From Swiss-Prot:
InterPro entries: Ribosom_uL1_bac-type (IPR005878), Ribosomal_uL1 (IPR002143), Ribosomal_uL1-like (IPR023674), Ribosomal_uL1/biogenesis (IPR028364), Ribosomal_uL1_3-a/b-sand (IPR016095), Ribosomal_uL1_CS (IPR023673)
Subunit structure: Part of the 50S ribosomal subunit.
GO CC list: large ribosomal subunit
Origin superkingdom: Bacteria
Full protein name: Large ribosomal subunit protein uL1
UniProt record similarity statement: Belongs to the universal ribosomal protein uL1 family.
GO biological process, one term: regulation of translation
Length: 217
């Protein structure tokens, strides 16, 4: 979150300034950083959730599904990139790396998936009922994720980092994604916080400076 904190911009202005200042010779990512009045190391609270970016991520979102029988067929038909059962779990145990962004599982697979939790967990891939990724509605969930759903979690400093696109996006599309992320994070405000919840919001590109966004509390 480096940048000149003395200047603040509206979300629209900040995004336009960011795009104009991006000079790298590659397609830089655009990220939002939201500083919250929670810090895992002190309060034990963290903010975690998921949000569908209205304009997507600008790339394919890949999904793996653990299911069998008719549920596996539904997942495949819905566009899941990897579909497997116990055999897939065994392959992962032996070192197969899943090149995916999300994993979904039917509830009956969770006891078996626990055996690879130490593999999936650090990559943020463990199916979780809070994200709707432990479900029998596989086709629906695959569709939601493929449409551009992203996960987020506050770090130990109370900061949520989310990619909202890249410099190839229009300002309008980035603004839509930005607003969706901010609304999702604001909607998860803990009841234990009595004062200010959002302390600062910044947008930045991979190699560029950050721009502080005003008017978000």
């Amino acid at each position: 979150m480096s940048g000149d904190g003395s200047c603040s911009y509206s979300a629209e202005e900040g995004i336009r300034e960011l795009l104009q200042s991006a000079k790298a010779k590659f397609r830089e990512s655009v990220d939002v950083a939201i500083k919250l009045s929670v810090a895992d190391s002190k309060s034990g609270e963290s903010i975690r959730g998921a949000v569908v970016l209205p304009k997507g991520l600008g790339r394919e979102v890949r999904v793996a599904v653990f299911a069998k029988g008719e549920h596996a067929k539904q997942a495949s038909s819905a566009g899941a990139d990897v579909v497997g059962d116990e055999e897939l779990i065994e392959e992962i145990k032996k070192g197969r790396r899943l090149d995916v962004d999300w994993c979904i599982a039917t509830p009956d697979f969770m006891p078996q998936i626990s055996a690879i939790a130490k593999i999936l967990g650090p990559r943020g891939l463990m199916p979780n009922p809070k994200f709707g990724t432990v479900t029998l509605e596989l086709a629906k969930m695959v569709g939601i994720i493929k449409s551009g759903q992203v996960k987020f979690k506050s770090d130990r400093y109370g900061i949520v980092h989310v990619k909202i696109g890249d410099i190839g996006f229009t300002p309008e599309d980035l603004l839509e994604n930005f607003n969706a992320v901010v609304a999702a994070v604001q909607g998860l405000r803990p009841t234990t916080i009595k004062g200010s919840y959002v302390r600062g919001v910044f947008v930045n590109s991979t190699m560029g400076r950050s721009f502080r966004i005003a008017g978000i509390g």
